[in-house]
């Protein structure tokens, strides 16, 4: 069995200006400095306007915190007003980029085709995509959550070579659990994450599937993270609201101490 380093990532969404971002990352770095946290990878997904500040801080202080963006254009450049390209994110030395977050799918009509194009754009420029998938409440209530989520995984990874797919991070985020305080039960999250790994084995190989990190996201807090992280197919958390409170996020990162 492959060991997968847990990835604990904070998705700040549209919060924290660049000055607040600096203060926040400094607090995280300080709180995480007293112990060696190599066993867990920590990342923040910041608004575009914060990335340069975060980069300067991380580079300057040689912080172990990784950072990335919350979206990427499918295009490399040109007349796409308001968009941010892969080359721009690569220049800022981003490690990660979230692709297909449910808020992008919902408010910006991102289809699996668009998400797939963005996943490819991320790889083209050396960024690791965090492919976000997950069902709405009506889909879960109808019992179609696994099928729905696996279709998003397949659509997002379409035509992607194994050399690329093996480094993808997949975030299972049931839409009804995002920002609602309704956490998906650990067993329910495990069911879908195991199914995602099964789909990767079917699309590529069991060996590749065993390497891919699958995160859970949706109302993760310090109080529920340990139970979620104890599940065999859950390799990290994508944390929204609770990642804006540095003390709380540090507790989430240190779930093993609980
Ligand atoms: O969407 C999420 C992370 O990407 C989850 O958000 P919350 O943790 O606020 O529910």
Curated annotation (Swiss-Prot):
Binding site for substrate: 11-13, 179, 219, 240-241
Active site: 101, 173
InterPro entries attached to this UniProt entry: Aldolase_TIM, TIM_sf, TrioseP_Isoase_bac/euk, Triosephosphate_isomerase, Triosephosphate_isomerase_AS
GO cellular component assignments: cytosol
Species: Streptomyces coelicolor (strain ATCC BAA-471 / A3(2) / M145)
Gene: tpiA
A Pfam entry, by short name: TIM
Alphabetical UniProt keywords: Cytoplasm, Gluconeogenesis, Glycolysis, Isomerase
Record bears the keyword Chaperone: no
Record note on quaternary structure: Homodimer.
Protein name, entry field: Triosephosphate isomerase
């Amino acid at each position: 069995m492959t060991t997968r380093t847990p990835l604990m990532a904070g998705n700040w969404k549209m919060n924290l200006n660049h000055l607040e971002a600096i203060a926040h990352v400094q607090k995280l770095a300080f709180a995480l400095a007293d112990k060696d946290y190599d066993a867990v990878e920590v990342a923040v997904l910041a608004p575009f306007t914060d990335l340069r500040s975060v980069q300067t801080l991380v580079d300057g202080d040689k912080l172990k915190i990784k950072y990335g963006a919350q979206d990427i254009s499918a295009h490399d450049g040109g007349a796409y007003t308001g968009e941010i390209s892969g080359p721009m994110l690569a220049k800022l030395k981003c490690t990660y980029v979230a692709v297909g977050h449910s808020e992008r799918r919902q408010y910006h009509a991102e289809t699996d085709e668009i998400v797939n194009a963005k996943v490819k754009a991320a790889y083209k420029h050396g960024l690791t995509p965090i492919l976000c998938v997950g069902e709405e409440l009506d889909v879960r209530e109808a019992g179609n959550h696994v099928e729905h989520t696996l279709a998003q995984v397949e659509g997002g990874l379409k035509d992607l070579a194994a050399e690329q797919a093996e480094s993808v991070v997949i975030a299972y985020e049931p839409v009804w659990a995002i920002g609602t305080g309704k956490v998906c039960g650990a067993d329910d999250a495990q069911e879908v994450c195991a199914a995602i790994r099964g789909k990767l084995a079917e699309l590529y190989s069991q060996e590749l599937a065993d390497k891919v990190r699958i995160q859970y996201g949706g109302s993760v807090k310090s109080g529920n993270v340990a139970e979620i992280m104890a599940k065999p197919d859950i390799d990290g958390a994508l944390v929204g609201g609770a990642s804006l409170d540095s003390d709380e996020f540090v507790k989430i990162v240190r779930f093993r101490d609980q």
